[in-house]
Amino acid sequence: MALRHLALLAGLLVGVASKSMENTVTRNSTAVINTQAEGTLSPPGLSSLPVVREWALTHTAQLPECCVDVVGVNASCPGASLCGPGCYRRWNADGSASCVRCGNGTLPAYNGSECRSFAGPGAPFPMNRSSGTPGRPHPGAPRVAASLFLGTFFISSGLILSVAGFFYLKRSSKLPRACYRRNKAPALQPGEAAAMIPPPQSSGNSSCRIPLWGFPSLGQSQGALWVCPQTGLPGSGSRPPLPGSPGDPPTRQGQGRIWLVPPALDLSWIWPAPPARPPLIPVTSMLFPVPETWGLQERRTHHDRADPQYLLLLEVQLHPRTDAAGLRQALLSSHRFSGAGSGGPKSQPVRKPRYVRRERPLDRATDPAAFPGEARISNV
C-alpha cells in the first residue's frame, strides 16, 4: 500500500514538473516573439527606414528601461520600441514615439504594472504580459511546485505510517485499555469455540469415578473428582448418597473393577493394619462380584484404622439412567465393564459443530472465563 502511494506521488511530481516546463517554454517563446515584433515595429512613415530599425535593435541592451526618467507626456525615447514595464509607447503627431509612464492620462491595467492608452490610428498597442522583464519566467514557479510535492509526500507518508503503527500496536496488545472496546467479545474461530465447550456425554456406557466413602480425607481433598451420569460435569460438588443399611440385600448382579492407585498394597494388607514400609507394586486391577460388596461394609467398620496413604479408587462402568442416584445403583448395575482387557473405558467420538453463532450483548464481561458461555454451538 505504501509503494502504491509513493508511485502516485512520483507521477504527480513528474506531471507538475512537465507542466511547469511547458509553461516556461511557452512564456519564453511568446516573449521572444513579442520582443521581435516590437523591435521590428516602426511608426508610420518610418517603416521603410532600415537605419532606425537597426539602431533600435543595437541599443536594446543599453536602454532596457528608457521611460524611467521620463516625466513629461511629450518626452520621447531614443528607442521607441523599448519601453520598460510600467510604461507604454505613444505615437506623436509628427511621427515620433514616446514612452509615457502609466498615470499620465492613461487607464491602469489589471495588475497595475501595465497600462493602456489611446494610441494613434493604425498603431498597434503593445501590452506587457508579464510583471517582470520580458523573456524571463516567474522566479516562484519551481519553488511552488517543489513545496507542493514535498508537502503532499510528507503528509501522505505520515498518515500511512501512523495508521499502520496504530494497527500494529493494537495487534500486539501494546496500547492502553482505552483503545480497546469493552462491550464486544473477541472473535473466536469455530475450532477455538468448540475446544472451550466440554464434550457431551455419550449414549452408550460411561465411566463413573467415585471416591471411597469410608475415608473422609479423600472427600475433603482438593483432588477428589466427582464424575457421574447424574451431574455430567467434573467438580460440580454433588456427592452421591450413601447406600442403605448394611442388612439390605442387593437386588441385581453385576461386575465392577477396582483400580489400585500407586503406591498401593494388596487388599489383605490394608486391614487390619498396613505394614511400616509398603512395597512398590504396579497398578493392578481385579474383578469382584457385586453381591460380595465387602468394600462398603468394611470401610464403614475399619475406616478409623485405615491409613489415608493407601486409598483405593473405584471405577465403575454403568449405563446412564435418570433414576440412577448414587453408588449403590452403580455397583448393582447389570451392565458389565466394556473393554475389560484394554484397561479403560471406551468413549464415542465427539461430533464437531458445523457453525458457531455468537451473541454480543452490550454488558458483556472481558473475563477470559466467560468466553465459553458467549459462544453458542449448534449441531443442526
UniProtKB/Swiss-Prot annotation:
<keyword id="KW-0812">Transmembrane</keyword>
<feature type="region of interest" description="Disordered">
    <location>
        <begin position="229"/>
        <end position="256"/>
    </location>
</feature>
<feature type="glycosylation site" description="N-linked (GlcNAc...) asparagine">
    <location>
        <position position="104"/>
    </location>
</feature>
<protein>
    <recommendedName>
        <fullName>Uncharacterized protein C1orf159</fullName>
    </recommendedName>
</protein>
<feature type="compositionally biased region" description="Pro residues">
    <location>
        <begin position="240"/>
        <end position="249"/>
    </location>
</feature>
<keyword id="KW-1133">Transmembrane helix</keyword>
<keyword id="KW-0325">Glycoprotein</keyword>
<feature type="region of interest" description="Disordered">
    <location>
        <begin position="336"/>
        <end position="380"/>
    </location>
</feature>
<feature type="transmembrane region" description="Helical">
    <location>
        <begin position="148"/>
        <end position="168"/>
    </location>
</feature>
<dbReference type="GO" id="GO:0016020">
    <property type="term" value="C:membrane"/>
</dbReference>
<feature type="compositionally biased region" description="Basic and acidic residues">
    <location>
        <begin position="356"/>
        <end position="366"/>
    </location>
</feature>
<feature type="glycosylation site" description="N-linked (GlcNAc...) asparagine">
    <location>
        <position position="111"/>
    </location>
</feature>
<feature type="glycosylation site" description="N-linked (GlcNAc...) asparagine">
    <location>
        <position position="128"/>
    </location>
</feature>
<dbReference type="Pfam" id="PF14946">
    <property type="entry name" value="DUF4501"/>
</dbReference>
<keyword id="KW-0472">Membrane</keyword>
<feature type="signal peptide">
    <location>
        <begin position="1"/>
        <end position="18"/>
    </location>
</feature>
<dbReference type="InterPro" id="IPR027888">
    <property type="entry name" value="DUF4501"/>
</dbReference>
<keyword id="KW-0732">Signal</keyword>
